[in-house]
A protein has these predicted regions:
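Active-site-proximal, Lys/Arg-enriched surface segment
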Residues: 1-40
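Flexible loop/turn segments at secondary-structure boundaries
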Residues: 12-14, 57-58, 89-93, 114-117, ...
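An anionic, glycine-rich sequence signature occurring as long contiguous blocks
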Residues: 96, 100-200, 288-312
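Short, solvent-exposed helix-loop connector elements
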Residues: 177-184, 200-215, 232-243
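A short, flexible helix-boundary coil/loop motif
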Residues: 133-135, 224-312
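Electropositive, glycine- and tryptophan-enriched low-complexity nucleic-acid-binding patches
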Residues: 26-75
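Short, conserved catalytic/metal-binding motifs centered on acidic residues
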Residues: 2-11, 45, 80-90, 106, ...
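Domain-level cores of phosphate- or acyl-group-handling catalytic modules
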Residues: 57-115
Length: 312
């Protein structure tokens, strides 16, 4: 939990409820959207928490609640965790709130507007440090009108004055800007990889805006995602690289098996699972293995039956 990525993920909603419509892509017509907001561990590529909201609520409205949830889970010490976000989170009110009230540091791109591009060109040349061919960085103080005093990291690409291109980032703390810009921030794209690989399990579309139903449906999908993530770790290529749809179609739907009850244990037997030896070493005699890890093997939502597997 030392590097986190926060990102909104909006999906088409088919709710009958009257709600504000939203244009998600340029050139498309407004449609009903269900909003979800996520925090992912950018190193493990796995979700920490999420929340959902109607299109009436903005990123500025929802993100403080989301970060409170992440803080209650991770309980980071000040300066221990860095949150990377997109330019939609560039708000003085939001940045100040997270900086002052939580233990998270924040790194946010500054929107590519003319006023900002002009300010980058006015930075003296001696404040830029050439890192390698075509890449230089500068670290300068930055004050927001509705926020506090922070740091602005500016990256400059190009070798000649006519070719210079700039991109600015706001950091709530003084840190190494090269690591932040070339190592930390690019990991934010793991959020998109997570959505692309797993959204078929429950967050590709929304059929209702009832919050109880939405939270239950998405939470159940995340339980499935966590189980499949562990399964991928025990499958060799190409299975380990397949997205959720591919796994469902060409792995799960093609496995034969049966389910039996033996005493207080539900036994699931698979007959043609790939990498059976690796799966057998991990999942057979599962109740005994859980007890060795001080985990109770009874499953509450299976009427406290234990769950075990066999591979033939």
């Amino acid at each position: 939990g030392k590097l986190l990525a926060v990102d909104p993920h909006r999906i088409r909603s088919y709710s009958k409820r009257r709600m504000r419509e939203r244009v998600e892509k340029g050139g498309s017509r407004p449609v009903k959207m269900a909003q979800t907001f996520w925090v992912l561990d950018a190193d493990t590529h796995q979700p920490v928490c999420f929340t959902t909201a109607t299109t009436a609520r903005s990123v500025v409205d929802v993100t403080p609640e989301l970060m409170d949830l992440a803080e209650s889970i991770l309980q980071p010490a000040p300066g221990q965790a860095l949150v990377v976000a997109d330019s939609e989170h560039f708000s003085g009110e939001l940045i100040e709130d997270i900086h002052q009230r939580t233990g998270f540091d924040l790194l946010v791109p500054i929107p590519n507007r003319p006023v900002h591009r002009k300010s980058y060109r006015q930075i003296p040349e001696d404040q830029f440090t050439r890192r390698w061919a075509g890449f230089a960085t500068a670290k300068v103080p930055y004050t927001m009108k509705r926020g506090g005093k922070y740091f602005q990291f500016v990256e400059r690409t190009g070798e000649r004055l006519d070719d210079f291109r700039y991109q600015g980032f706001l950091s709530t703390t003084d840190r190494d800007e090269v690591d932040a810009l070339t190592s930390d921030f690019p990991k934010r794209w793991h959020v998109e990889e997570f959505f692309n690989a797993n959204q078929s399990m429950g967050w590709r579309r929304g059929g209702t805006q009832n919050l109880n139903i939405r939270y239950a449906q998405m939470t159940t999908a995340l339980i499935a995602q966590a189980a499949i993530h562990q399964l991928r770790a025990h499958l060799e290529e190409p299975f380990s690289d397949w997205d959720a749809s591919h796994l469902a179609k060409d792995l799960f739907f093609r496995i034969d098996g049966d389910v039996r009850v033996s005493g207080d244990t539900i036994v699931v037997t698979y007959y043609n699972a790939p990498n059976a030896e690796r799966l057998r070493s991990r999942y057979e005699k599962l109740p005994e293995k859980l007890l060795k890890e001080s985990v109770q093997p009874e499953v509450p939502w299976l009427y406290n039956y234990k769950l075990d597997f066999r591979f033939r």
